[in-house]
């Protein structure tokens, strides 16, 4: 496939390389490699490209990346090919082309969407095992995802669409299975990031592309642009980078087109490797270079790729493998191509080489950790970059580099990198810096590279910066990290300097970064760059210490891969390459932070691709503010830069420290930091001088904040830094910058110092941050969106609290805010970005005129407030500098754990998206909801991590558990804070700041997580919830408890925390479900709970969350929770007011969509149990939301976990997937009903089905161990209080204790206090439908034509399918009455989802507007299931599953039912009976009105009947009409006219004629068709034959034929009538004779029989009946007569055209339309005559 695709793309590389290959490659390649994942990704990709002309190719390009990545995971060589193919042929795009086309109208949002989607694939790529899982999930949900993407994006449109698509994807995936959900979460995160990159690119590409282009046009303009975009995309794994590239490309359609084409071309020429080399030289000419260059590197690299590819992939196993895979397989070709290769040689040539390099490097570097680290980073990235840069700078250099790369000498490549670095002082240096970053950055590379290339290409200001960087790089050439930092600063600088250009690239890069981080979730090498690097390094490092990495990978592959492996990898990486790695980390960290920040900033536009779309305005506003702030910051710029440098250095040091938790490396890193400080000042100065104001300030503010953020971000928050930077950049950044300017200068240092203290965390964070960045990119997007949307509010808040914020940010803020942003951003942003944030924010921003209202509503509904709150909280938290410091110290440990857990959260990217959903629904609640998903992923990961990182991150373990709870608690308390802050950001923030500070202080004191809970309040709210959910199965309260636990665990409670974490994790699994459900509920909960909870729930909520859940661990948390609750209540009230004013916020499409999205993941647990009741739709989720936290308490933490798991949708099992999907559908169709306002009503209306669904799902979960939270074998959450009000309430919890708890969501408030077990007696009964022993599934049931019985009508034409993997579950569920998996109606290439419902105690399935693709490999994953249609109610079809396969044809009695006793009815009776005997189609020709309108075409059988009747008598239309009305089941003449007048009948007849012509040409045709069960022509032949036969039998009723006469009529094809004129004229009983002769023939083959024919025979007949005999004869021999006519036609055609093949003759005959139509008319006349005679 790859080869073909590659070859094809080569041929079609020019313009439609992507497009051409798309369709072809689509199904096989991505599907083979990772169909589900690929499909989803493709889908995502689809939307991205659709925005522009280029997008399709890009998409194709990207997808190849994705695909190759997956393929890689699947097959190393395949991946290599795929990667090559991807680069060249854009096979993935091919896959996605239709999707892309489908989403073409979506524009930017789709791009963002695609980006998200890509992110998904990136994540999945990054986690190969996950990738597989992801693939699996997407296998089940790819179609769903695709259609959903399609539907969601189109419905939402704009940025909202993106989030929707993302959420959809996320959720759909997530529904697939917990594991899948996890994978998908990661994927989603990546997707999420991808859109940011794309949007960023799109937004900035216009500017930056132009500068980029102008520069790149020299040699790599297109390349570079592509690089930028693709780099962005690259960051997310190949697919991602392509996507981002796409996004960028879309912006620059023509240029991008060229680039893309070139990219493809270059990729295409991969086989033409030598040319590519030569062309690489040509690379100076950007396009030629690209295409040529790419081919060469590709050719060269593919081998290496294959080799190293396989290795890295395999070695990297999950994270590294995923990353390597992504980078190597998908990313490298696509990513590098896009990102690095694109950068250079248009990434095409270089891309391939770059990609190849990256891949190769990855592979080889993966094998050789240091080389991979360097080469991968450098070689893949750097070299790619270098070649690109060189290409840009020097053709020859590039060639050299390419040669090296091509040579794929890892050393050589490394040398190349070094050489490039040196030879291309900045290009190379940047490249090198980039390189490390580059892979690090494949996101970064893409960023760095792009930056470097962009830098170079962008402006030599960048170049200067880069040059400086290059020197810096040279300085730190020993330590690539420094180069990276240089690169980063340059990058940042460039990004900022080129503002849009660079930012575009950077955005692209950041996205790449984000993606990379996501992709490289395994290692968050320094920041984005370092992270990517470290990821790469991790790839390489793990290769070096592959086992370590693999260990990491193993966990990563479980999802920890992202979280833990990153840390471990980070540790390993620094160890593996302490000098370069450490330096790289530190530099990379700085870079990453700067770059991350830049990226964040740039990503601010994109990074929140959704946010970008949504917050673009705000971003722009922020941009203005930022620029204003930048001006301020330019003053502070140096200081900030210095601080940043220091902070970065510290960060780098911390990064390393945190990364490896290696104090050993800390010194190195610190040395590096010093170096960095030394270098960085230069770099920063250069940056300052060039992009100083924009870039440095942003970098400074962002770097500073981000560094703190990174530090605070702990890996998870590492991405948060991006987010935070994004937030900062959008909102906070301005404020932060201002604050930094104001308090930042002094505090930056303080924060830097704090960072130093936190630096270990920060170092890890950067790594994690990288991934976090990716995730954060997603989260960041949302958060940034939130902030951008809240930017004004936040600005006010920040301005008000900017100093405290700055203080916090700088000191504690780094942790707090980072934590907030990280944890919140991570998840919120993902969630928000994915859908809620982007959609809600964007939508609300557009819809709501009041920003504050929007913020409040969004905060409450979308989690915007959480972000705002995050900021305000972080401000407050920052105010508590001491807190911040202590917190930061504490958080170092905590952060480390958080990194792990955060990373896990990140790993649970799906959770993040869910968080986003949750966030969009309810800042807090949504966050909490989201957290469960991460919890799911993270939970396992966390547990593994806890196990895995005990030595390294015992705190991490504790932190994970603690952080999880802390996050949850924080979110719970922060939710209110956030909401309140969102609502009263300006006024309340100050007041809240103290509260938050207090709360935060308490939390800080409680646990390092505390800071998280403060800043994490928002961040943790979402992110931390996720973390909390992830880390601690507990949803929110666990977070606080976790904080306390963390504190305790740090001392020695790690084990207990771990246990709790495990419980929490379990809970989180459940929570995920609930969260998924809760998402939808969040909004309603927001409204209804605002009302209900405000009074009872305030205390209860606070208590349950803070006290109940936290009490076990720390009362202080509960207090802060209380405050948070109060704030939340306020926010909720505000939101409620807003919603009341503007219902669309909560009820409109947004709410609906949010619900839908939420339902998709079904893994969100509400932050506040109180909110849980709101959404009936996803009881499980709501339940999770409500009481995941209470479960946190050690004793009941597991138990509550089942609460979360109550939905059972989170369970990895297919059933859970189905249930989640069902719930999702439920939510989707009930989302409007379940508005918070009338959640009770909604609950009543939906609760029964939901409860039944939940009950069934619970049962299934139990039986199938599908339970998510109850992942603990015994813990099966039977509580399926799916009632929106009692989401949590109805949850039956069979946690580890296996005790069933039912937390009544309705009693959420009270249940919040104490998850009261709700009686599930009623619910279960409601949830169970009457059992059905057997299910009619094709191949699983008897094929006898037995009547299936039961109500409903069986329609042969309507095909329903069920997933093969779900069949057993399905049967079991129907038997037990539980909720079965969904079934799907086949609609051409789509599957429409039908979700189970219970109506009148019967299990029925209702149509939804969720669709999956149904083509390629997907068709082999489903089996037909027989259903009967019950009714069409509320515009929904309801069907039931048959217990036995229904008869093909309706029973004769039905058919022969005579509507009227007219003559036609008489004839219709026989006809009907005859029809029955003949075939369903012919049998069913019911006598209907001959009117054309009589039967709607949908009912084919009716059509057939019409056909039949019309053919029977065309001449008696009126009679037919009258008779047909009543005689629907009779096959009387009436159909004929109507039927014959239908297009369907004409087509049928045409096919009939075609077959007869074929038979006339080749008598064996018929036998061959019958043997092969032809479905194209045979059915038409049978239909016509059936009609003829039915009419003939009708005539027989009127003709009492003598047997011998009958035999003669049927034997002889020729009939002559002999009459006596006199008698005939007189009309007497004249005796007429009929003479029959002719040669007998075989009725099947129509060949003349060889047997001697009897002599002609004559029969005397009644003259009045002669016509009937003649009609009977004509009907009987009609086929033969037409056959003879066909022979004549064929002979006439052959005379005119000799030497024609059969096909051509058939076509020529059929082209004679008049001939065919004449025959059709005669056929109609014949049937009409029959009808007339029989009527």
Curated annotation (Swiss-Prot):
One term under GO cellular component: chromosome
PANTHER family registered for this protein in UniProt: GLUTAMINE AND SERINE-RICH PROTEIN 1, GLUTAMINE AND SERINE-RICH PROTEIN 1-RELATED
Annotated Basic and acidic residues bias: 1120-1132, 1492-1508
Entries under InterPro entries matching the protein: DNA_MethProtect_Complex (IPR052466), DUF4211 (IPR025451)
Biological role: Plays an essential role in the protection and maintenance of transcriptional and developmental programs. Protects many bivalent promoters and poised enhancers from hypermethylation, showing a marked preference for these regulatory elements over other types of promoters or enhancers. Mechanistically, cooperates with TET1 and binds to DNA in a common complex to inhibit the binding of DNMT3A/3B and therefore de novo methylation.
Keywords of this entry: Acetylation, Chromosome, Isopeptide bond, Phosphoprotein, Ubl conjugation
Pfam entry (one): DUF4211
Ranges of compositional bias, category Low complexity: 417-440, 1269-1286
Compartments reported by the entry: Chromosome
Modified residues (N-acetylmethionine): 1
Gene label: QSER1
Quaternary state and interactors: Interacts with TET1.
Domain of life: Eukaryota
Modified residues (Phosphoserine): 586, 615, 886, 987, 1211, 1230-1231, 1239, 1348
Start-end of Polar residues biased regions: 267-297, 971-985, 997-1024, 1449-1478
Protein name: Glutamine and serine-rich protein 1
Linked residues for Glycyl lysine isopeptide (Lys-Gly) (interchain with G-Cter in SUMO2): 1058, 1083
Main localization (coarse): nucleus
Disordered as annotated region, ranges: 267-301, 414-440, 479-518, 533-561, 964-1033, 1073-1132, 1178-1217, 1256-1286, 1441-1532
Annotated positions of the Phosphothreonine modification: 949, 1341
